[in-house]
Amino acid sequence: MNGDDTFAKRPRDDAKASEKRSKAFDDIATYFSKKEWKKMKYSEKISYVYMKRNYKAMTKLGFKVTLPPFMCNKQATDFQGNDFDNDHNRRIQVEHPQMTFGRLHRIIPKIMPKKPAEDENDSKGVSEASGPQNDGKQLHPPGKANISEKINKRSGPKRGKHAWTHRLRERKQLVIYEEISDPEEDDE
């Protein structure tokens, strides 16, 4: 291995990196006046570059992200009269419609069907557990509603503090853990 070869490649890499950096800085400089840009330190400029890069990445993934504050001023001027067809962020928002909670709630089916409380107490399929541990025993008394029924009643139309509690479910079979001994320990 010749050490001179590794150092010979380094200036080209630095030139590419500085070219990318200057291109990114020029892109960010459009959001600020020349006076503001000259006052800024290098660390502030690079943080704005990363902020814009993160914003673009998140919008490409389809997330609804608030526009960074320094970019809001530029878009306000674009609304006043500039052509919007060249704005990359605008195209991304059009291509990826934002998913709201209401749409998501309609798309995802509910796990537990809603039934009146009388029907749930009469049906034994919900209150009984089949399996070797329980042998068909009831998990809760027939007169009382189980925990999942209470949660389902509370989370119906209210949808306030506990919006996702309707997804909780009660275990049908008890989980019993046993200690497994090693065969080597048994030999001793």
Swiss-Prot record:
Q: Where in the cell is it found?
A: Cytoplasm, Cytoskeleton, Flagellum axoneme
One Gene Ontology cellular component: cytoplasm
- Positions bearing Phosphoserine: S123
Here the segments flagged for biased composition (Basic residues) are 153-170
Which InterPro entries would you find in this protein's record? aKRAB, KRAB, KRAB_dom_sf, SSXRD_motif
UniProt site positions, description: Breakpoint for translocation to form the SSXT-SSX1 fusion protein: K110, I111
Q: Which residues form the KRAB-related domain?
A: 20-83
Please give the biological process terms from Gene Ontology that the record holds. negative regulation of transcription by RNA polymerase II; spermatogenesis
In the record, the note on similarity to other proteins reads: Belongs to the SSX family.
Q: What is this protein called?
A: Protein SSX1
Q: Gene symbol?
A: SSX1
